[in-house]
Structure formats: structure tokens, C-alpha cells
């Protein structure tokens, strides 16, 4: 192996570690809902400049928020089985490097949104960053078992950001998209917390199963799933969406409710794991249904 090829491999490996700091699998779902918000905001095509700069800008700031989350929690991550392989606990990147990286990509993302999208989107995205990386990660997460419920507001913002990127305003329909993700967040994360309870207990994180027990958490998964099922019908009831969406969401909700019932009545870690994975697919499919219905409304 030549010196140049070795240097290239090392550089590529370093880039991959910084990329991992952005939690690409999580961010991809966030950005997907933001892009769908862009398309839902207009009856026709999204202006190409808004689509490109809005998507890239939101992606960069979301990646910076994820990197700050990794930075704040890296000592906890080193203890938890699910997260001990992340770059910071493994020593693949340093704390100063992570801080520099997140400031760089976050700052450039905000600059891009301000200059080439609109100031409203930039300020909303900055507020979302602060809500997730500071208010949720630093303050709420180690303080209260309701961290997911309260902090879920920041996680529900991406479709609103996408909407604002194209229209320069926030409409009632955009807030409906926010409400869907806000209602989705508790059953999604509590399913994870149930089968990862031991990990959270190790680090003293007050997740709901740790502070209130499994039965209480399972009940709340069911209750919030019912709320979600009601909320997700609202786009049809408000005539934002039509029958394609309604048919799709009723099927998706029925499956989600099935998992919630199983978690409540016949809990196993495997069921909770399956429910968590389904909840990710659920959100992606629901927003896909919104998009398809938007252009083929009847």
C-alpha cells in the first residue's frame, strides 16, 4: 500500500467518524419530513432553489444538533450498550474537534438558510436547534421523565421548517404536521426506553420506565398511541388531505395500535423492539401518503 493511498484511507475514516456524529439515520427521517413539508406547502412544484438550499441547510443544522447531543452525552454513551460504539466514547474524535465540527456545519447551515431561503426559516431552525440540543438534551432529559413529551416539540418542527422555507410563513396545515410528529414521539421513544431500561438505569437517566415502572409506561404507550390515531385523521377532517391519505393512515394506525395493545397486555422486549422499528417506518409511510395524496387528491 502506498503512502498516498494509506493517507486517503485514514482521511476517509476520519470523515466517516464525523459523519457518524450527525446521526445520519435519525437526521434522514427528520429531513424527509421537512422535504415533505415543502411539497405540501404549494399546489405545484417546489422552487428548486428553496428545495436545495432548504434541504441542505436544515440537514446541516440537524446534524449539528445531533453532534452536540453526542458531545453532551458521550460519558453516558460510553456506559450504554446501544451507544458505546459512537465516535466520542471510542476516542475516534475529540471533544474540541466535535465542538469545532458542529459549530462549522451548524453555522454554515444557518447562514445558508438566511441568505438563500428566508430569515424566518433560519430563526425557526435555530430555535429548533436550541430546543433539541440545549433545552431537551441538557436540561429536560436528565431532569424529568416527561422529557420526551416536552422535548418532543423540537423534534416535531421539521415539516414546519420545510413549509416556511417555501412559503415564508406558518399555516394551520403546517401546524397539523407538527402535531402529528408531536403525538408520535412519546410512544416511539417509550417503546425504546422499555427494552433499554437497564441502560438508562445505569446512567441515572429518568426515563419513564426507570422512574415509574414498566406497567405505567406501557399504559402511556397505549394512551399516546390512541391520541396519535386521533390526531393523524385530522388532515382528512380539515380537508388538507383526501381519501388516499385516509385509507393509508387508517391501516398504519391499526398496525401501530396493534403493537401498543401487545405492549400493554403481552409485553416482551422483542415486542417493544418491533414496535419501535415499526414506528419509524410508520412516520415515513404516513408522510409519503400525505405527499401522494397531495398530488393525486380525490
Swiss-Prot record:
Pathway: Porphyrin-containing compound metabolism; heme O biosynthesis; heme O from protoheme: step 1/1. Converts heme B (protoheme IX) to heme O by substitution of the vinyl group on carbon 2 of heme B porphyrin ring with a hydroxyethyl farnesyl side group. Pfam families: UbiA. It comes from the Bacteria. The keyword Ribosomal protein does not apply. Belongs to the UbiA prenyltransferase family. Protoheme IX farnesyltransferase subfamily. Its EC number is 2.5.1.141. It catalyses: heme b + (2E,6E)-farnesyl diphosphate + H2O = Fe(II)-heme o + diphosphate. HAMAP family: CyoE_CtaB. PROSITE patterns: UBIA. This is Protoheme IX farnesyltransferase. GO terms for molecular function: protoheme IX farnesyltransferase activity. CDD domains: PT_UbiA_Cox10. The chain crosses the membrane at residues 26-46, 52-72, 93-113, 120-140, 148-168, 174-194, 219-239, 241-261, 278-298. It comes from Nitrosomonas europaea (strain ATCC 19718 / CIP 103999 / KCTC 2705 / NBRC 14298). It is found in: Cell inner membrane. InterPro entries: Protohaem_IX_farnesylTrfase, UbiA_prenyltransferase, UbiA_prenylTrfase_CS, UbiA_sf. It is a multi-pass membrane protein. GO terms for cellular component: plasma membrane. Keywords: Cell inner membrane, Cell membrane, Heme biosynthesis, Membrane, Transferase, Transmembrane, Transmembrane helix.
